[in-house]
From Swiss-Prot:
Residues that bind ATP: 11-16
Example of a GO biological process term: glycolytic process
Class of enzymatic activity (EC top level): transferase
Coiled coil spans: none
Gene behind this protein: glk
Domain of life: Bacteria
Catalytic reactions on record: D-glucose + ATP = D-glucose 6-phosphate + ADP + H(+)
The UniProt record lists the keyword Zinc: no
Compartments, as annotated in UniProt: Cytoplasm
HAMAP family in the cross-refs: Glucokinase
Stored Gene3D superfamilies: 3.30.420.40, 3.40.367.20
Organism: Xylella fastidiosa (strain M12)
Name of the protein in question: Glucokinase
Residue stretches spanning the membrane: none
GO molecular function: ATP binding; D-glucose binding; glucokinase activity
Taxon lineage: Bacteria, Pseudomonadati, Pseudomonadota, Gammaproteobacteria, Lysobacterales
Length: 337
């Protein structure tokens, strides 16, 4: 691997996996060094700093700069992963790694920044609305981004005259809005367990299990302990309840993605990312996702013109962190050690 003279360590840290790579901020169109990517289970390390040390030792590279995208809320010097017990302190981590500069950003800030360098080969169109390609330097665009994985990430990207401004949100934690009698019953069942039910309780890996458990309770069945992959495998084998679960997941996903467009004013398109999208892509394409996405009453005709695009780039979080490293001066809230 040929590393640049001053590489930046970029990381995409979720509730399950920690992904690391190197970025060359001098490269405009492709700042991520793809052959540098490594992935580790977060459970294998007591802290993010130790995971990063392991990566740098493994590849034999020294650097003093980093951009870490965290699947959780970033509050000044501290970031908490929503679905994992790691608490990340910027100054402590920077000192542990010997960094001069360390940026902590929300993972969907990174996902949003990646949009600016995605090409047609990196996305698959869902529905008939087409994505309008454009020269970034002349663009004025509003995009939404949503992605189910261990949790549900939501963000956006505003582009003005070639400058990219990511929108950091915790939109996965807004209340789930049921739209059918079946969804109302599911909400009632999940409310007994969780009290308040957010979109993330349904549209995520654990959400697949929650939907299946609720449908099983409606049918008077005890399904026993199941993992998300067990349910998707059963659906692939034709199991009726598992198939209902995946179809309902896709339909609700479409409905809340359409809501995101209306809330953010993401009139130029919405990007679907996260670990579940590639795995469920065929189901999303052949489900009621677009129907529920577009079915917004008096705005249905407008929604029909808005593209929804599944991101198939293998590492959009790392790519976006690399773009952030390249464009730090354009992004508010620079964090330095």
């Amino acid at each position: 691997m040929n590393a640049p003279q001053a590489p930046v360590l970029v990381a995409d840290i979720g509730g399950t996996n920690a992904r690391f790579a190197l970025a060359n901020p001098t490269l405009t169109s492709a700042p991520l060094l793809n052959d540098s990517m490594r992935e580790f289970a977060v459970i294998e390390f007591p802290s993010l700093g130790e995971a990063a040390q392991h990566y740098l030792h493994h590849i034999g590279i020294h650097t003093t700069k980093g951009v870490f995208a965290i699947a959780g809320h970033v509050d000044g010097d501290e970031a908490r992963i929503t679905n994992h017990p790691w608490v990340i302190t910027r100054t402590r981590t920077a000192t542990m790694l010997g960094f001069d500069t360390l940026h902590l950003i929300n993972d969907f800030v990174a996902q949003a920044m990646a949009i600016s360098v995605l090409g047609p080969q990196d996305v698959i169109q869902i529905g008939s609305a087409k994505w309008e390609q454009f020269p970034l330097s002349a663009a004025t665009r509003n995009y939404g981004i949503i992605g189910p994985g261990t949790g549900l990430g939501v963000g956006g990207l505003v582009i003005r005259n070639g400058r990219c401004y990511p929108l950091e949100t915790e939109g996965g934690h807004v209340s789930f809005p049921p739209s059918t009698p079946e969804e109302i019953r599911i909400l009632e069942i999940l409310s007994q367990q969780f009290g308040r039910v957010s979109n993330e309780r349904l549209i995520s890996g654990p959400g697949i299990v929650n939907i299946h458990r609720a449908l099983s309770e409606i049918d008077g069945i005890d399904p026993g302990p199941l993992r998300p992959q067990d349910i998707t495998m059963r659906a692939a084998d034709g199991d009726i309840r598992a198939t209902r679960t995946i179809n309902l997941f896709c339909n609700i996903f479409g409905a809340i993605t359409g809501d995101l467009v209306l809330i953010q004013g993401a009139w130029d398109g919405v990007f679907l990312t996260g670990g579940l999208v590639p795995k469920l892509l065929n189901s999303i394409q052949h489900s009621g996702f677009r129907q529920r996405f577009e079915h917004k009453g008096r705005f249905s005709a407008i929604m029909a013109r808005i593209p929804s695009l599944a991101v198939i780039h293998p590492h959009p979080g790392l790519l976006g962190a690399a773009v952030y490293a390249r464009d730090t001066e354009q992004v508010p809230q620079e964090i330095k050690a």
